[in-house]
Structure formats: C-alpha cells, structure tokens
C-alpha cells in the first residue's frame, strides 16, 4: 500500500512539473459577433485556427531559444479558451435597429442600407470603448485568466478586430505596474497623505484596484487624469486595503505571457494616446516599462490586404523604446513588434474575416513574428540587416 501511495505521489509531482509551463490561448472576439449566427462563425473559426497555430508553435525550436521560459516542458492546451463578450452589446444594438426601422420609411434604400451596415459592423467597437461597458468585460476576462492560472496555466491573449481594444485595456487596467508611493508623489497629493503612504508601504498595484469598484483610491477620467478620492481620511483608510484589492482586481502575477492582436484597428479608435498632452501617456509609459521588464510580448499581426488592419507603430529596438519613453528600463526581455505586411492572398473586401480561412498563412506569420520580434529588439546583427 505504501509503495502504491508513493508511486501516486511521484506521478502527481511529475504531472505538476510537466504542466508548469503549460500555456492557454485565450481568443477574444471582435465586432459584429453579437447574434447566434456570428457567434458560431467566430467560435468555429477559432476552433479551426487553434490546432494549426498550436502545432506551428510547438514545432518551432527557435521560440524556445529566444524565450527562455519556454523550455522543453512547454505544452499548449489542446482546446482553445474562447472569451466572448459580443452578447453584452446585443440589447443596445437591438435598440439601434429599432431606430433604423423608423428611418426606413423616410430614407432612400441606399441610405438605409448604408446605415444598417454601419450599425451592424461598427456598433460593438464603439460600444466596448465606453468605460462603463469596458470595465465589466475586463473583470470577466480577468476571471477567465484567473481560472487558467488556478489550473497552473500561463496565458496568451489573442485579440481579433475590436477584441484588440479589450486586450489593450486589459493590459492597461490589470497589469500591476503602479507603485503606490510614486503615484501619490506624482499626483502631488497632500504631504500628510504622502507621509502616510510612505509609513505604510504596499505592493505594486493596477489601475483597476485603485478604482471605486475596489480600493476607492480614485478613478481615471475621460481626459486621462487619475482623480484621487477627495476625502483624505477615507483615502487613507482605503489605501490600507490596496494589497487585498490588488489580489482581487489585477492580473495573476506572472501569468500573462503575451498578447497577439490581429485585424487590428486600434490606432483608428485610440489615436488620442499619441497626444503628448493626454495624461494616460504617463500610465502607458509605466505599462510599457513593465511589459519590457517582465518578458511580456505584444505582437500585432495584420494581413496587408485588410482595410481595418492598421500598423500600431514603427518597430523600435529595446534601446529606442527606452529613449522614446524617457524612462529607464532595467534588463528588458519583453517584445513589442508589428507585422502588418502579411500576404493573405485574399481580396481587400474579404481579408478582415479571412484570418480563420487563411489560418496556415496566419499561424506561420505569428510564429515567425515571435522570433523576429525578439531578434529585432535584442540582436544587433539582425537590427543591422539592410532589409530593415
């Protein structure tokens, strides 16, 4: 009996070791997926893409060379994890369609048709951008990430189309890149508040944990300002709960390994982040610093024929990112890389919805960009190639 028990314990330990670096791929839907037909289209596309992507990922030995955490025990969950938020916008879209029915009697057929297309394809993208809609989606996504983490899985988020808004906001709101003491100093809080914070140090936290839904420290305004709770005594009391709220609100520590955005229109909808006067840039700098220092990668992969696949930025080396941000990045290992020139061999009218049917081409590009992105940022020989 003892021998059997010992064997069981050894097998359990072996299983835990083997699964230590198992990855879950979480796929996040885009716009126009809020009815049953489109939901099924999206989910069927993911189920066809995932095994092809998984196979290419596991076969590529260079990934293990450049990403040291992905050692010989690397495994990827066989089933895709599908995070679907499209149903949450359906009630609002139904209201828009009712208003369209009113216009049908007074508009030309061409105008009515154009309005219908705009509403169908852009409504969800506009809907999910609104803070009061986005925040519950982020909390639900975080529960999905936590569930995978509780099973011993690291995660890579795959954001499709308007799903790239969700991945961006998830990193912005859920990564623990905020040092509370430095935050209060930056915001020029009252001296007695800063002294209180220094006397009661807390761990790094995330934007979500600071909000009134959690710790009640403050909220980010539409202008990009973090507005502190004006009740100083309540602010101090709330501050002491930050560590607990960080545990509840922020991404599980070390579990989010990367993001792959594709069919990405994020530049079109979030162009204000390029404005130096927009204060969210301060937090974006901290977020990117965290990404680079914690070995997280952000890839953007677009078909060149995709009219909604916008390049996110010019590719920069790790040193150039540091210079551009104006912050010190210590021992960077993260990757931020854009490849918006993937040839899908599809016409422009079909390219945005062809990432599933052209899954071989798309999967090959993702795996190639994992490697080339790392080499671009850290390999001087690769950086100096004439092609770049």
Where are these regions (language model features)?
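Extreme N-terminal starter segment of soluble prokaryotic enzymes
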Residues: 21-25
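Hydrophobic/aromatic beta-strand patches that form the interior of the parallel beta-sheet core
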Residues: 26, 81-83, 156, 258-260, ...
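Active-site catalytic motif of lipid deacylating hydrolases and related acyltransferases
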Residues: 28-151
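Lipolytic serine-hydrolase domain surface
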Residues: 37, 228-230, 249-388
